[in-house]
Every structure is written in C-alpha cells, then in structure tokens.
Design a protein with these regions (language model features):
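Catalytic-pocket segment enriched in acidic/His residues
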Residues: 16, 96-212
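Active-site microenvironments in enzyme catalytic cores
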Residues: 1-141, 210
C-alpha cells in the first residue's frame, strides 16, 4: 500500500511508556509525528533490524490505521467521520534510544515499519470504536485493545491534524499503540532477526512481517 501522508499519533493509550519504561502523565494535547515512505514495507515483506547500536532498542507498535477518503481542512470532530474512507493495520517500527534525542530519527529507519494488506471501508464496520487490535510476536499475544480505549478519539485526531494541513484522500493516520510493546515489558523484549510479527484489526486480514 501507499499513501500521501503518513501521520502518526503518539501516547494515545494509557500504558507504560516504552522509551522511558514508566507511566507518563496523560497528554493534554494530541501528539503527532510523521513517517517517510522509505520506512514502510508491505504485508509479507521483510522488516529490517537497523545496523549497529540501533538494533538494541528496535521495537514494534501495532496500531489501527485510518484512511482518509474526503479532502478537508479545519474539520470539526462532529464532521470527521465523513472524511474517513476506511481502516487498515499498521506497525509503527521504532528505535527507542533514538527517540530520546529525535522522534523523527527513532521512527524513520528504512524498512522498519509496515501497513496493510487490505483496507476495510467504514460502511463495513458497525462501530469503529469497537475495532479490536491484537499483536502477536512469534505467536504470543503481546497487545490486545479496542479503539474505545484511545485517549483521543479517531474523530479528534482527524480534526486536529486538519488544523495543521489539508487532509487528502489516501492520507493515513496511525492512531497510536497500546501497552505491550517490547520497550514496556520487563525485561524489555525488542525485535531481533528471526522474529515473526503479526498484527490484526477486526474484520481485516492480518499484517504479517518477518524480521531480518
């Protein structure tokens, strides 16, 4: 899959912060960052562990992705649903130690993230707040949540992003990741070559990637 803008939301679930290993205060505002297309691979393509020291804190983040279907600027939360085309599955690959000095650097290693393989249209979902997200690392369940656990709703995320720039059809918003990433575990469990990552969102084909 490809998209125009890859917009990601940080700290959108109550959880242990995988960068610092502690419970952060609840954010008062939506935290946004972006990803380059070069950081993304598709379903069944290999995710590459970064070279050198970055490999020691390479982590996964299963997320629900929202695909924009209608152009908009300064969208109100009450009208945001009109601008959704559908939903998909996203893995926000992250190098935790690099995040400490630069979110952009920590989130944009080449071939570190993935999304897909399919999009389910919004009319196929009765209530998007009940979308269930699960992540499996080597068949072990490590993340399990629903969209109604988000701190900022999907509508609020769309509205906020649209105050910064015009949203276009094909833009993607990755809506944040719940507890259970490797950096929040004790002991930490970061990705290594040979791992298999599987992320599911209800109603969609699982996103599966080998880690090499």
């Amino acid at each position: 899959p490809s998209s125009n803008k890859l917009i990601c939301v940080g700290l959108n679930y109550e959880k242990i912060y995988p960068v610092e290993g502690e419970n952060p205060p609840k954010p008062q505002n939506i935290i946004l960052f972006g990803k380059d297309q070069s950081s993304i691979v598709a379903h069944n393509q290999d995710i590459e562990v970064p070279l050198g020291a970055a490999a020691q804190s390479f982590d996964y983040e299963g997320e629900i992705a929202v695909i924009i279907g209608k152009k908009g600027k300064d969208i109100s939360p009450s009208n945001a649903f009109e601008h959704i085309f559908g939903y998909s599955v996203f893995n926000d690959g992250s190098v935790r130690e690099w995040q400490k000095h630069s979110i952009y650097a920590g989130k944009n290693f080449e071939k570190s993230s993935s999304w897909g393989p399919h999009i389910i249209t919004k009319d196929e979902i009765k209530d998007h707040k009940k979308l269930r997200l699960t992540t499996f690392l080597n068949s072990k369940l490590v993340q399990d949540t629903t969209a109604d656990k988000m701190i900022f709703s999907i509508e609020e995320q769309i509205a906020y992003a649209s105050t910064l720039f015009t949203l276009f059809p094909g833009d993607l918003i990755a809506t944040g990741s719940p507890d259970g990433t490797g950096g929040s575990q004790v002991p930490k469990r970061h990705l290594i070559s040979g791992d298999i990552l599987k992320i599911t969102v209800s109603g969609l084909t699982a996103l599966v990637n080998n880690i090499v």
